[in-house]
Amino acid sequence: MSLNRISAAEAASLIKHGYNIGLSGFTPAGTAKAVTAELAKIAEAEHAKGKPFQVGIFTGASTGESCDGVLSRAKAIRYRAPYTTNSDFRKAVNNGEIAYNDIHLSQMAQEVRYGFMGKVNVAIIEACEVTPGGKIYLTAAGGISPTICRLADQIIVELNSAHSKSGMGMHDVYEPLDPPYRREIPIYKPSDRIGLPYVQVDPKKIIGVVETNWPDEARSFAAADPLTDKIGQNVADFLAADMKRGIIPSTFLPLQSGVGNIANAVLGALGRDKTIPPFEMYTEVIQNSVIGLIREGRIKFGSACSLTVTNDCLEGIYNDMDFFRDKLVLRPSEISNSPEIIRRLGVISINTAIEVDLYGNVNSTHIGGTKMMNGIGGSGDFTRNAYISIFTCPSVAKEGKISAIVPMVSHHDHTEHDVNIVITEQGVADLRGKSPKERAQAIIENCAHPDYKELLWDYLKLAGNRAQTPHAIQAALGMHAELAKSGDMKNTNWAEYAK
């Protein structure tokens, strides 16, 4: 059957107030752009007439300016899940304007399938090719596309010529069965393929194909600096030492690395350390640094959910697919982030913390315990199931006025039971096999900034010793309270809490 070509505005007009929309993509890579931008215009026009217009948004992870940005400013989002990075969306969430469900990325597709979030009315899927028989070839990300395509009543395809058809075949599309029929996911090494290179849909559900030429709205990250370079080197030195001790096999293990300049610095340091053999990635996001290391032969294979790279880097991949075809695979997020596979492969996870407390609990989502930053993303998927779980962060922020090492985190995302290693520019705290009191000593000695060490030791004295996990409950968030009061955690006075 022939597919109906329509404009982005025509496609957006088919979406009604109250609909739930499923979107392709994972980060700005591979996400819808043209239709959501037109949908924001409709919302603004309806609001100007005094009429309501809001939709629910289901995605694989964050999107880009032409989705989360424009829709947030148009006040067109009623509900959204999961992770996001857009500043306008963040502002709306923290103002209480959007209901935001910050769940683990590996759970998103299955929770939609289980019916936890309601019906999917329309799926908007970016593709580099779509056939009359309903084969949709995704662009730079897998996300939750297989699930939302199957569940949606209707599908709109954004056929984006900014993505070369040479990328066809990069995806490995696999959707597990739901309980009680689910079987093991048969991936035993990062390069295994178990599915199809396309998403198969009923072509009768495709109500329109929108032709676009719209590059991904990828973010670039700050270049490495002495601080991030030191953190990266500390990570590389730690992993090399663990390999020398025989804790990590001599062949090394697959890595997962988060997003951002610290993650890039870590990968750069690992690439330079020739005591670490060429390795594989089983991760959620591939950034420019990974592509560079693949070209250099330092990374043998990269399995991920998305190619979150700059547009010139992506063009280079498309132009060199003969080289990359057997070195990259893109998967749906419930496979790239599958706890089952992460544990089977022995993935080493490296993620970024906002703050870490003395016992190894990590806050990776909330500023001051209440204001959402971005979300938990896939860090929980990997941390709890990793062979070794690592969290990195600078020891201080805001010109030293904020310590990343605190007595008690203001929001818990990753518990002390899941965090193995904490690394700052100051050093490495190995928490494996340690009691809470031993963990506190390791974190203060090795990770805290010198300006805060005495303050943290004094807190432990105030907390006393007659407990499994010592805390002075009345003072546990004292450094956060002082930051709110004076703007500098260093001004904390424990004597105020000892009365």
Over which residues does each language-model region extend?
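Conserved alpha/beta enzyme-core scaffold
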Residues: 1-499
